[in-house]
């Protein structure tokens, strides 16, 4: 039986700001873009959450909910540096670490001999080390499978942990809301609820073939999760799958011509990022993303081993066709990266954007 820990830092970006600037403590604080630049909230502290402020919320709306909200732009390099400290703490206990972001990770401590091999005690030790060495609190979930460890890490926040022993999984899973399963979003949860499926126990008694017919591969995965099954190992090597750049516009724009004026700057920055961080990786697709004034978004992609600037403009035209009269608040471009490195025979121009095309 595996021993999986999911560690999740508590309101990470905001916590770093409160650590470094004590005057923010006890006051509603958010890290994000300004309302003048039509930004969104990256994260916020618990004082702000009491007003209904949430991550990914438009800054303007967050400030309506909480007029006294303190907004700071964020210091990404500081967050990365602290994340490296935390990663070093993890490595004292196991080499099997799957980082999900700067502030959360899975750890497989099945073979760890420290603290008598107890995953519960190991999680407690990791959280103590993080607090002592970074001044930040972390929450943790402990379970025999990944998705339950992630669910558990949310159950005793902040600065706590929750353990689901193997023999308690059937009892725990039976009443678990489907909305708590990672990957089940609001729309999917509503579709499941319309079928009378609200808990894992409901799924356990529902005809399996009907679920698979209705939901395909997701239905098959849901059946497993509803029984507490998750055979996924940790992805210890997590090479980035894409490189992209996007911009939130100061004002909504509405026409293809206006979007085309934004593209050269995005493409130039994408070229810079590719040459800096993915120059030896094979490209397999190009992507254009639009976010509209109602915060819904669309992406158009084209699969190819070659990168063409003109293709970005063609994808943009296809994306604009989905506009339906809405304003455009965000525009982005990206390329998908394959797992393979480029071989020497491949034209090096395939790894960069040729801006003269």
From Swiss-Prot:
Binding residue positions for Mg(2+): 8, 103
Enzyme class, UniProt record, top EC level: transferase
Xref: Gene3D superfamilies: 3.30.70.270, 3.40.1170.60, 5' to 3' exonuclease, C-terminal subdomain, DNA polymerase, Y-family, little finger domain
Keyword Transferase listed: yes
Cross-referenced InterPro entries: DNA/RNA_pol_sf (IPR043502), DNA_pol_Y-fam_lit_finger_sf (IPR036775), DNA_pol_Y-fam_little_finger (IPR017961), DNA_polymerase-Y (IPR050116), DNApol_IV (IPR022880), IMS_HHH_1 (IPR053848), Rev_trsase/Diguanyl_cyclase (IPR043128), UmuC (IPR001126)
A Pfam family that the UniProt record links to this protein: IMS_C
Gene Ontology molecular function terms on file: damaged DNA binding; DNA-directed DNA polymerase activity; magnesium ion binding
UniProtKB keywords: Cytoplasm, DNA damage, DNA repair, DNA replication, DNA-binding, DNA-directed DNA polymerase, Magnesium, Metal-binding, Mutator protein, Nucleotidyltransferase, Transferase
An example Gene Ontology biological process: error-prone translesion synthesis
Ranges of residues in domain UmuC: 4-185
Catalysis performed (reactions): DNA(n) + a 2'-deoxyribonucleoside 5'-triphosphate = DNA(n+1) + diphosphate
Residues at the active site: 104
Cofactor(s) in the UniProt record: Mg(2+)
Sites marked Substrate discrimination: 13
Co-factor remark: Binds 2 magnesium ions per subunit.
EC annotation from Swiss-Prot or TrEMBL: 2.7.7.7
One term under GO cellular component: cytoplasm
Subcellular location: Cytoplasm
Oligomer status and interactors: Monomer.
Summary of the function given for this chain in its UniProt record: Poorly processive, error-prone DNA polymerase involved in untargeted mutagenesis. Copies undamaged DNA at stalled replication forks, which arise in vivo from mismatched or misaligned primer ends. These misaligned primers can be extended by PolIV. Exhibits no 3'-5' exonuclease (proofreading) activity. May be involved in translesional synthesis, in conjunction with the beta clamp from PolIII.
Family: Belongs to the DNA polymerase type-Y family.
Protein name stated in the entry: DNA polymerase IV
Organism (species): Shewanella oneidensis (strain ATCC 700550 / JCM 31522 / CIP 106686 / LMG 19005 / NCIMB 14063 / MR-1)
Taxonomic lineage of the native organism: Bacteria, Pseudomonadati, Pseudomonadota, Gammaproteobacteria, Alteromonadales
Protein's gene: dinB
